[in-house]
């Protein structure tokens, strides 16, 4: 049996919203594997993990910059939210986004080596900011969408100032028709993505491992049923999964679209555009997703400081 610690139980509880004893049992049953424990709880019908499993915490800012038919998102992490509210840090993050869009760069190492407006290279500007502010900072990722003809939709949720916030969204709609007719829809879809958090444009874009994991959960949840019945249940469950996770299959959250999917709304817009409209790409950056936030023992820190060890 794995050594299940209180910290592990706490982490699983935060991910799933499940009671402490159920979390402890799940960890014991899965050898202390957090992700396996999430699935174990889902299979037992004890978890809200489908909605909460992706919740993580990290500090910093997402920056959004749009220039014509190009848009960029960047994420820069800091150790504390206090630094994220620092004007010098905000200035740096905004300039990183500007460099990315002007030079068409998304590779982190290439960005660090790019020319910085104030002189030198961007990597040096980050190092200087670390020295000045006194806290470590990391340029984590960047994404760029360019549509030669069409529209860029963007949205920043939990904005701390213009173009900076906690959740940033970019979406690109390509059309040879009237781009102005498409622009309002691009904005609507960006807001939809922020709220609905799709994983891919359609089923073909989903990670095969994610699909297989969902199949396994559905199969085990319905274990014992005849094979032909189980096959239909899994097939039906996957269709529901695609409606939840694939952008074109999701129902628009705008009342005026009357229950239509995003794919159907795009088709409707083609009449006004006078040409086909294609959703070519989207990005949704939530600050800190996929990062494990280090937790410190405050009492131990105080004791260490008092004894001169800190």
Swiss-Prot record:
Main location: cytoplasm
InterPro entries per record: EF-Ts_dimer_sf, Transl_elong_EFTs/EF1B, Transl_elong_EFTs/EF1B_dimer, Transl_elong_Ts_CS, UBA-like_sf
Region (Involved in Mg(2+) ion dislocation from EF-Tu): 80-83
Membrane-spanning ranges: none
A cellular-component GO term for this protein: cytoplasm
Name assigned to this protein: Elongation factor Ts
Family: Belongs to the EF-Ts family.
Record keywords: Cytoplasm, Elongation factor, Protein biosynthesis
Role noted for this protein: Associates with the EF-Tu.GDP complex and induces the exchange of GDP to GTP. It remains bound to the aminoacyl-tRNA.EF-Tu.GTP complex up to the GTP hydrolysis stage on the ribosome.
Organism per entry: Beijerinckia indica subsp. indica (strain ATCC 9039 / DSM 1715 / NCIMB 8712)
Localization (cell): Cytoplasm
One matching Pfam family: EF_TS
One Gene Ontology molecular-function label: translation elongation factor activity
CDD domains attached to this UniProt entry: UBA_EF-Ts
